[in-house]
């Protein structure tokens, strides 16, 4: 059995190696010739899986995408060809939620503000939006959720309109899939008109798809409204973001919000589970066996934690400042953008850290130990 796998997908050999011969490829430049004799195709979001790519892949039985989204895959065509498809919904949700929360802690410190007491609007209440909301709520922040699709589907959570979020939220974090049609399309959801409605000093984070915001309109807006702070992980035209916009963002990264070791491992593992299920093979591997021991796996708390100390603790698993600096130095070429994503292998999630001494909650801005547990620390 021949398995074609994206070279940036981790743990493929550990999980699929005993099932067949693995050939690693550049997912962004994958050609029909490379997949024509494949039995299994494992991809990420950079690969467009459609008729053009797999028209000659007559042996292909399984396509797995280690992503939460499916907009890069022609699922109807795969169904027509009777090719089994699966993705990995929720695999990186925790990583994205923690990225958004850590970014907010970083903004608060940079601009001498407290995150506590702010109102956060989450646009998109799927897996990543829910994970982000969980972090914010664990920290005691008021969270407003906007997701008209979920509301129509009968989700019982309380939802508000996007206009309400724009009017009331101090921070807006975007977590929607990209859709170009329909009443609730998300392509250019934040266009020039909507950007101009943002209240003073809003923090705007985009952790989903670059085209959810009109990037050219955002450049014009930010040049006039520097009070609005931007954290951008996704860009129109990836892997070639607009240089003007990178310069204007407070924090800029190359579509790696979901790139924790845990999230990457979970994505590949979910595909492995599905493939074993499809073939009626036993699942011989475990997710836990893939992850290395974290160098700071046990932390002793010396007392109460302030917000600033929580940020320092967060930087042990992920220091956003490093990625921001590195990205600004390499984003100018598509090769640099993708190379940084490929080399992004060090980030962990809060769960990698165990706190071994409880802390007391005080009313002077210090952190409740149950809050740390709810954030994901052990």
Swiss-Prot record:
Magnesium listed as a keyword: no
Name of the protein described by the UniProt record: Erythronate-4-phosphate dehydrogenase
GO cellular component assignments: cytosol
Location, primary (coarse class): cytoplasm
Pfam families: 2-Hacid_dh (PF00389), 2-Hacid_dh_C (PF02826), DUF3410 (PF11890)
Coiled coil: none
Transmembrane segments: none
Catalysed reactions listed for this entry: 4-phospho-D-erythronate + NAD(+) = (R)-3-hydroxy-2-oxo-4-phosphooxybutanoate + NADH + H(+)
Similarity comment: Belongs to the D-isomer specific 2-hydroxyacid dehydrogenase family. PdxB subfamily.
Location(s) in or outside the cell: Cytoplasm
CDD domains in the record: ErythrP_dh
Binding positions (substrate): 45, 67, 259
HAMAP family attached to this UniProt entry: PdxB (MF_01825)
Molecular functions (GO terms): 4-phosphoerythronate dehydrogenase activity; NAD binding; protein dimerization activity
Recorded metabolic or biological pathway in which this protein acts: Cofactor biosynthesis; pyridoxine 5'-phosphate biosynthesis; pyridoxine 5'-phosphate from D-erythrose 4-phosphate: step 2/5
Summary of subunit composition and partner proteins: Homodimer.
GO BP annotations listed: 'de novo' pyridoxal 5'-phosphate biosynthetic process; pyridoxine biosynthetic process
Enzyme Commission code: 1.1.1.290
């Amino acid at each position: 059995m021949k398995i074609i796998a994206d070279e940036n997908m981790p743990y493929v050999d550990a999980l699929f190696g005993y099932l067949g011969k693995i050939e690693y490829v550049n997912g962004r430049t994958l050609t029909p010739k490379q997949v024509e004799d494949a039995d299994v195709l494992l991809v990420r979001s950079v690969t467009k899986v459609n008729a053009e790519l797999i028209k000659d892949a007559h042996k292909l039985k399984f396509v797995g995408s280690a992503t939460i989204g499916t907009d890069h895959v022609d699922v109807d065509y795969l169904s027509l060809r009777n090719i089994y498809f699966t993705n990995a919904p929720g695999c990186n949700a925790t990583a994205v939620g923690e990225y958004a929360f850590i970014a907010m802690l970083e903004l608060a410190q940079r601009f001498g503000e407290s995150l506590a007491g702010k109102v956060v609007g989450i646009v998109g209440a799927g897996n990543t939006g829910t994970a982000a909301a969980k972090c914010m709520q664990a920290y005691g922040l008021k969270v407003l959720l906007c997701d008209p699709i979920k509301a129509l589907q009968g989700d019982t959570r309380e939802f508000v309109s996007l206009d309400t979020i724009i009017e009331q939220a101090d921070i807006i974090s975007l977590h929607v899939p990209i859709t170009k049609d329909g009443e609730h399309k998300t392509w250019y959801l934040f266009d020039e008109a909507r950007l101009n409605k943002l209240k003073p000093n809003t923090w705007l984070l985009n952790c989903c798809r670059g085209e959810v915001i009109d990037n050219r309109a955002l450049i014009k807006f930010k040049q006039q409204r520097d009070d609005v702070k931007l954290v951008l992980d996704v860009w129109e035209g990836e892997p070639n973001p607009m240089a003007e916009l990178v310069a204007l963002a407070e924090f800029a990264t190359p579509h790696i919000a979901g790139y924790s070791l845990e999230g990457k491992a979970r994505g590949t593992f979910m595909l492995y589970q599905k493939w074993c299920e499809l073939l009626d093979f036993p699942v011989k591997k475990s997710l836990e066996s893939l992850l290395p021991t974290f160098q700071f796996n046990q932390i002793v708390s010396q007392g109460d934690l302030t917000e600033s100390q929580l940020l320092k603790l967060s930087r042990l698993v992920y220091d956003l400042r490093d990625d921001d600096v590195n990205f600004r130095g390499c984003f100018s070429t598509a090769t640099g953008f993708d190379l940084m994503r490929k080399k992004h292998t060090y980030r962990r999630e809060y769960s990698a850290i165990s706190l071994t001494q409880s802390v007391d909650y005080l009313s002077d801005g210090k952190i409740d130990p149950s809050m740390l547990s709810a954030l994901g620390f052990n």
